[in-house]
Curated annotation (Swiss-Prot):
Record remark: domains: Has four distinct domains: an N-terminal nucleotidyltransferase (NT) domain responsible for UTase activity, a central HD domain that encodes UR activity, and two C-terminal ACT domains that seem to have a role in glutamine sensing.
Renumbered residue ranges of the record's region Uridylyltransferase: 1-337
UniProt-listed Pfam families: ACT (PF01842), GlnD_UR_UTase (PF08335), HD (PF01966), NTP_transf_2 (PF01909)
UniProt protein name: Bifunctional uridylyltransferase/uridylyl-removing enzyme
InterPro entries: ACT-like_dom_sf (IPR045865), ACT_dom (IPR002912), HD/PDEase_dom (IPR003607), HD_domain (IPR006674), NT_sf (IPR043519), PII_UdlTrfase/GS_AdlTrfase (IPR013546), Polymerase_NTP_transf_dom (IPR002934), UTase/UR (IPR010043)
Domain HD: 457-579
Purpose of the protein: Modifies, by uridylylation and deuridylylation, the PII regulatory proteins (GlnB and homologs), in response to the nitrogen status of the cell that GlnD senses through the glutamine level. Under low glutamine levels, catalyzes the conversion of the PII proteins and UTP to PII-UMP and PPi, while under higher glutamine levels, GlnD hydrolyzes PII-UMP to PII and UMP (deuridylylation). Thus, controls uridylylation state and activity of the PII proteins, and plays an important role in the regulation of nitrogen assimilation and metabolism.
SMART domains: HDc
Organism, as annotated: Acinetobacter baumannii (strain ATCC 17978 / DSM 105126 / CIP 53.77 / LMG 1025 / NCDC KC755 / 5377)
GO molecular function, one term: phosphoric diester hydrolase activity
Record text on activity regulation: Uridylyltransferase (UTase) activity is inhibited by glutamine, while glutamine activates uridylyl-removing (UR) activity.
Family the UniProt entry places it in: Belongs to the GlnD family.
Gene Ontology biological process terms, A to Z: regulation of nitrogen utilization
Length: 887
């Protein structure tokens, strides 16, 4: 029992309707105290609804409506007695006939008093029975509210009408079809997934609306008031009801906290609130745990809960369709195809032959999915079979996993060429995959608290497997031409599938997830028929699944030594081919924004160069002189018809060997032609063209200008202002004191090379700024994205010496923000450092950038200079991060 102050104590002493405002404030505090003292959220939200009833009855009488024949109904969540702190108070005033003028005045008084109270958010409709019929017939929302309309006060004869109206205007089938179409639209608005980074706990798949949906459809047909009543009708089991109620209470509690934190009706579990709400549920990081452990465990519970809700929603509504809707269709004839002794296909869905199949033949659990994987014509699983399957999955134990028949069935599913992804998603959803591979069960719902990994670990893993499967489908060969060709010639494609399944399986355990996952995979591989050699290859792929992407992202892959070092770590073409396919599939399954033709070109370039090194022999040293001569010859062939070789040589002799080692013949010819045409023009030269290997996304910007301080900082500031994201930069300073800079940028709008006016704007902005870089304002003030303010990223600076280049490599990891590159470039200038090249990577909210620098005399920093510079750069990054968090 929750003790709250009686309303009459307030209105009788104050003689003022507005006193209800103070009463609501006081009882809301009392409700919160009760909640904090252990009262269940169910009791709290019901008590709040009853208190609102009390206030409305008082106001109804105050407006003298108790003397009318009208009825006051609660609708929506209020009708279900589900009131959160800032929920709308949705009501309907219903009349049997046309409303008299006198009652209209009373209604007006009642509505005015509702607004006068001040802390109600009323949603009011006034209808006659006839208008209800007319609106319900054409408006699904109206029909839905009528199903749960609850008479608060007034004419009790009207209480039966709302549901009667729905029965008159909608059949079981039309209402079911309309609500399912509405749900599909709602799902689409939330990416058809339970695991969005900032989920809407009311409307997203697996949210409160999914539970409401079960109630609406069942109440419409069975004429019950509570989902609990459906147990006695055999529509839902006691166990399923308990799962739903526990999930509903958890979602209500989250929503309760969201309302109080946001001080409004808020359903989105934003980054702004996740950590604080996690703490309210007791998910707090303990000493020695990762910094985001608490919030990640809380979100894991949320995602698992949402998965349970959406699965029950799917099963129960399918059961309703199969048992109530379909059999009543005119001319309906059940179509049955016998598959074998265990299964049949009923109306295109798979069903067991009898309800004891899984108990008597445990292998049928996996056999069901084997059939699904190899029969694209089957549309799903019958609801009764699904109910049996979910219960049977809980009986999968070590003895089941050790059974050779079951192991063979599982591998047959993995090797299925048809519906691997859909089958594995179903196995996960219905509890089979997490029980068959317990380590996979541990990562289900596990999220990483950042903007880079937009999927939970389990969802990411299955998307990776989907991508691998696509590499053998002709329709994706155009999108992934090289990797598709490589994948199709792999001797054992199931090796890379198992590596994919286990590559992140040890996340969340602590320790090196790659090493732990490799150990799990070896144990699994031995049990499932792989040889020791194959197990070692699977383990190597898991241990090195980030090697290729990190090499392409953080190292200069135009440097032959970098490629040679990478190739030596692989050893042979087999390891290269397997790793390449795994890497491309992995990147595409991490974040859709991460993959573009620029990144694809980097992967392809690294693959082809490593392949060439392996084929010519890993032991052979790089012949730089021959490489330079070959590149010059190829470039001169492209120029010979338009320019005198003497003029070409004059340009080239100022550039140094590194330029000809790292640039392609095509790019050298492009640069040389532009410089010769530019002649003695004192203005900076700026050219744009599509990147030769990544034309769809990436643009190359070539700048030729007199070398002077602040060039890099000025250039990147202009590019940021023009909505261009720098991916790569190469800066060559010629002996003539001219700088040749090549930037690869991604266009946020995708119009740079198709809109001549915009292209000209970018060129002019660069020319103007580079003509007087010391006067350019530099940093641009742009709005900091809301999400960035909630990530606590430790800024790191690592400065090392590249012995071969005699340059310092500066690696920074920091919170990405507008103007970051310009800020860093400005600091380099102030410290008297020249930037020779840069690799820029934005991974969600994190920037991981690499710069190769020297002092003005071309020499690297010494030990003391490195220490001093590192401290200054770290301080600058810390200051920028603090400004973002306080923004």
């Amino acid at each position: 029992m929750i003790n709250t102050s009686p309303l009459l104590n307030y209105v009788s002493s104050h003689h003022d309707i507005k006193a209800i405002n103070q009463w609501r404030t006081d009882v809301e505090k009392q409700l919160q105290d009760s909640y904090e003292n252990g009262q269940s959220i169910r009791e709290i939200i019901k008590a709040r609804s009853d208190l609102v009833d009390e206030a409305l009855v008082f106001l109804w009488k105050h407006a003298e409506l108790d003397q009318s024949k009208l009825g006051l109904f609660a609708v929506g969540g209020y009708g279900r007695r589900e009131m959160l702190p800032y929920s709308d108070v949705d009501i309907m005033i219903l009349s049997e006939d046309e409303i008299s003028e006198e009652n209209e005045k009373r209604i007006s008084t009642f509505i005015s008093s509702l607004w006068d109270v001040g802390n109600f958010k009323p949603g009011i409709s006034v209808r006659t029975i006839q208008s209800c019929v007319e609106q319900a017939a054409t408006d699904l929302t109206v029909a839905t509210t009528l199903i749960e309309a609850r008479l608060i006060t007034g004419n009790t004869q009207l209480a039966k009408w709302p549901r009667r109206i729905v029965s008159q205007t909608w059949t079981d089938k039309t209402f079911y079809d309309a609500k399912m179409a509405e749900q599909a639209k709602r799902y689409h608005q939330h990416n058809n997934t339970e695991s969005n980074l900032e989920p809407d706990i009311k409307n997203a798949p697996g949210g409160i609306r999914d539970i409401n949906q079960i109630g609406w459809i069942a109440k419409r047909h069975f004429r019950v008031n509570r989902i609990y009543d459906l147990v006695h009708l055999g529509f839902i089991s006691e166990f399923e009801l308990a799962v739903l109620e526990e999930a509903e209470s958890f979602l209500w509690e989250i929503r309760h906290h969201l309302h109080r934190l946001a001080k409004r009706d808020e359903n989105r579990l934003l980054f702004d609130h996740q950590r604080e709400i996690a703490a309210k549920f007791g998910y707090v990081r303990q000493e020695g745990q990762p910094v985001n452990y608490g919030v990640e465990q809380f979100m894991k519970r949320y995602y698992r809960t949402a998965q349970q809700v959406s699965t029950l929603n799917e099963m129960l509504l399918a059961y309703f369709s199969e048992s109530v809707i379909t059999p009543r269709l005119p001319n309906y004839e059940r179509k049955i195809e016998v598959v074998n002794d265990h299964f049949k296909i009923v109306d295109n869905k798979l069903a067991v032959q009898h309800h004891k199949i899984f108990a008597e033949h445990p292998s049928a659990i996996l056999e069901l999915f084997y059939i699904l994987a190899n029969r694209p014509d089957i549309e799903g699983i019958r609801a009764r079979t699904l109910r049996l399957l979910i219960l049977a999955a809980k009986r999968i134990n070590q003895s089941y996993r050790d059974n050779p028949e079951h192991q063979a069935l599982f591998m047959s599913i993995i090797r299925s060429p048809y519906r691997l992804y859909d089958t594995l998603v179903a196995m996960k959803r219905y509890g089979v995959l997490g029980n068959y591979i317990p380590a996979f069960g541990q990562i289900m719902g596990l999220m990483q608290y950042d903007l880079f990994h937009i999927y939970t670990v389990d969802a990411h893993t299955l998307l990776l497997l989907r991508n691998l499967n696509r590499f053998r489908e002709p329709e994706f060969a155009k999108e992934f031409p090289v990797v598709s060709s490589v994948f199709q010639r792999l001797a054992r494609q199931d090796i890379v599938f198992i590596a994919a399944l286990f590559h992140d399986i040890a996340k969340g355990r602590g320790g090196d997830h790659s090493e732990l996952g490799a150990e799990d995979a070896i144990e699994f591989g031995r049990a499932h028929g792989f040889t020791e050699r194959e197990c070692k290859l699977i383990a190597w792929l898991i241990q090195n699944h980030l090697l290729m992407s990190l090499t392409a992202q953080k190292k200069d892959i135009s440097d032959p030594d970098v490629v040679k070092d990478f190739a030596e770590k692989l050893g042979d073409m087999e390891h290269l081919d397997y790793l390449y396919t795994l890497t491309v599939a992995d990147i595409n399954a991490t974040n859709p924004k991460l993959w573009n033709t620029w990144r694809a070109s980097l992967m392809r370039q690294l693959y082809t160069h490593a392949r060439d090194v392996i084929r010519t022999g890993l032991g052979r040293p790089v012949d730089y002189q021959m490489l330079i001569e070959d590149t010059k010859f190829a470039a001169s062939e492209l120029l010979v018809n338009n320019f005198a070789l003497a003029d070409v040589e004059k340009v080239w002799q100022e550039l140094g060997d590194e330029y000809f080692i790292k640039e392609s013949a095509d790019e050298i010819a492009w640069h040389t032609q532009a410089i010769l045409k530019h002649g003695d023009n004192p203005e900076p030269l700026v050219l744009l063209r599509a990147h030769r290997k990544a034309a769809q996304d990436a643009v190359q910007i070539f700048i030729y200008t007199r070398d002077q301080p602040n060039l890099f900082a000025t250039t990147v500031a202009v590019l940021d202002r023009m909505n261009l994201d720098v991916q790569d930069a190469k800066i060559i300073t010629a002996s003539t004191a001219f700088s040749l800079d090549t930037y690869v940028v991604l266009d946020r709008f995708g119009t740079l090379l198709t809109d001549p006016e915009r292209e000209e704007t970018v060129k002019n902005a660069l020319v103007k700024a580079l003509s007087q870089p010391d006067q350019y304002p530099g940093l641009m003030q742009r709005r900091i994205p809301r999400q960035l303010r909630h990530f606590d990223i430790e800024n790191t600076v690592d400065v090392t010496l590249n012995e071969a280049l005699q340059q310092n490599m500066v690696e920074i990891s920091t919170l990405d923000h507008p103007g970051l590159l310009a800020r860093v470039g400005g600091l380099f200038m102030m410290q008297g450092l020249d930037i020779h090249s840069a690799r820029i990577a934005t991974l969600g909210e994190r920037a991981e950038d690499i710069f190769f620098v020297t002092k003005k005399d071309g020499k690297p920093l010494n030990h003391e200079e490195v220490k001093l510079f590192s401290e200054k750069l770290k301080a600058a990054l810390d200051e920028a991060s603090n400004q973002i968090c306080q923004h």
